[in-house]
């Protein structure tokens, strides 16, 4: 059964526009504002059709769901993940509870990364700038068992010293120190079955703003 949904899909523009995370999407979709909160590591502040989801307390459910490779990220924290291998992003505006369950009053943002290709190859990107800006991104694809098991290894590290001088503490800030790395396995023993497994970790030691509990 066909279900009418207001959807914006971004594909070819991802690499051309250097889109690395969902916060870079605001210029590519109508009625969408996406930013990063200052009180949660990689926390998102998303507005779709006037409905805002920027809860800083992890005990509060977001009103807009973010999916990464089909897996829901249950809180706003960690939703602004830096990715080097984005393949497609879909923005579904309006309530999506029938198809996606809870936390979808405002809509759903689906982020899909590239799958292992089964062929050997890769890409590397480096950026160096002012204020100690250092960015390194890498991705490698390789077959393990030809036409059956493929592997993709990826990693990102971003560091900078910040661009604001704190006259009280006598230091620059806010500093950024972010690392994300992992591996994805694609198992296709035949034409009727496939299994995709991703193992990854990300660490964010970046400076964040002051925080107070909204329930106090």
What are these regions (language model features)?
Residues 16, 33-35, 54-56, 73-75, ...:
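Short beta-strands and strand-coil junctions in structured, solvent-facing domains, enriched
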Residues 17, 43, 63, 106, ...:
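Transmembrane beta-barrel architecture of outer-membrane proteins
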Residues 45-47, 91, 103-126, 134-140:
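N-terminal periplasmic accessory domains that precede
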Residues 56-57, 63-64, 69-95, 112:
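Short acidic/polar hinge/loop motifs at secondary-structure boundaries
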Residues 215-216:
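Surface-exposed loop/turn segments flanking beta-strands in extracellular/periplasmic regions
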């Amino acid at each position: 059964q066909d279900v009418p949904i207001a959807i914006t899909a971004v594909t070819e523009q991802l690499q051309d526009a250097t889109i690395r995370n969902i916060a870079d999407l605001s210029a590519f979709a109508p009625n969408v504002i996406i930013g990063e909160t200052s009180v949660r590591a990689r926390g998102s502040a998303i507005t779709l059709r006037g409905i805002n989801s920027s809860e800083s307390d992890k005990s509060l459910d977001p009103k807009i769901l973010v999916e990464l490779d089909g897996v829901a990220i249950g809180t706003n924290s960690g939703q602004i993940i830096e990715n080097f291998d984005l393949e497609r992003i879909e923005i579904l505006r309006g309530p999506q509870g029938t198809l996606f369950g809870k936390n979808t009053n405002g809509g759903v943002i689906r982020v899909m990364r590239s799958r292992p290709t089964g062929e050997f190859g890769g890409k590397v990107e480096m950026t160096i700038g002012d204020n100690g800006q250092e960015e390194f991104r890498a991705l490698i694809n390789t077959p393990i068992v030809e036409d059956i098991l493929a592997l993709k290894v990826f990693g990102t590290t971003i560091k900078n010293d910040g661009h604001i001088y704190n006259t009280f503490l006598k230091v620059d800030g806010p500093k950024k120190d972010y690392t994300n790395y992992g591996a994805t396995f694609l198992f296709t023993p035949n034409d009727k079955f496939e299994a995709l497994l991703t193992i990854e970790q990300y660490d964010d030691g970046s400076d964040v703003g002051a925080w107070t509990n909204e329930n106090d």
